[in-house]
């Protein structure tokens, strides 16, 4: 039988809320040679659309990336099968919007809750606040090494961390110039200038490379000293450290390198210092990233070069689950409505894991393949539960629908001076509603890409 004339019975349906996009629930025959574009033509014909709408198609929850014939063959199904095919508005390619020029490599990114500001951390040790015109509104200087993580806390506070082994709480200001908020530290902040350090948080013994902030005033940090630490955004809740006494005590036996670091920070001797609320120890290798559980801020997840994903009870400071993989893990993001943790690895792929599954059961639910180097950053789309973006040392950001194992789109660096494999590594990515996909890296650029319909289901 010729593949040009072979047909299969299909029944189309959609979960789109817009009733005008619904078709009658009636089976019909379609050529098995059709792919997404041909199926989209059929649905648009049924809808009698004046302007064609691009659609994606799913069968049994899996995105169709081949012809119907290839799908039937792969699944071992005959053309006598009736296929129930779901259609949904297609995610359109994200287009290049802007580049903001930074002084050094961009290693960390976050955005304000109102999406009016971008916060960046850089290898020059400076944290910056950017407006959406690409202007630096504020610089926060104090770190003595590269800034590897930055997080927005409130309109008067951010936190950063880096290679100098410390975290810093910074004072910012409201748009109206006021500086008060409900942090519990207001009375002590009156004499501290905007852009200055409120407190230095110490306790890690190696670079601090990841931060996350929860709504209950808690901070998590991940370090290359193999530990995760829990802190508060309210410095009064943490134990004070007498930094100057520690430095000046002649009985302290410290290395020459440590003495040098402490000499560099003597200028910050008047800044309050705080110890962590708890130190979480279980990893046997550098911890690359840590996050709070989206629905329960007493639970955290971390990934490490020791090949493991760990689940933490932050109330008792205990590791309550360990999932062991076959490769170093470098990044993690939660997809809460799907009950999945996405993890980027040193072997170039992204794996999806269900944190509820026992560590003795099958660990990996799905593997996303497409990158050609380390996957060092992940973020999810707040408006579409299936979408994920990833940053890699291969010089790209990829957009994924996790119902498929292949990337939907690839975003490359747009600076013409970038040389592939020389200065194109991407270190950080943030997917922000109303802004787009923000990425930064070795090209010293904060790049913004945005696509129509990219946030819609």
UniProtKB/Swiss-Prot annotation:
Q: Where is this region: Disordered?
A: 172-191
Q: Which Gene Ontology CC terms are recorded?
A: nucleoplasm; PeBoW complex; preribosome, large subunit precursor
Extract one GO molecular function annotation from the record: ribonucleoprotein complex binding
PROSITE patterns for the chain: WD_REPEATS_1, WD_REPEATS_2, WD_REPEATS_REGION
Which SUPFAM superfamilies does the entry mention? WD40 repeat-like
> Per its UniProt record, what Gene3D superfamilies does this chain match?
YVTN repeat-like/Quinoprotein amine dehydrogenase
Query: WD repeats: which residues?
Result: 101-140, 142-180, 203-241, 282-322, 324-363, 370-410, 421-457
> Which protein, by its recorded name, is this?
Ribosome biogenesis protein YTM1
Source organism:
Candida glabrata (strain ATCC 2001 / BCRC 20586 / JCM 3761 / NBRC 0622 / NRRL Y-65 / CBS 138) (Yeast)
Gene behind this chain? YTM1
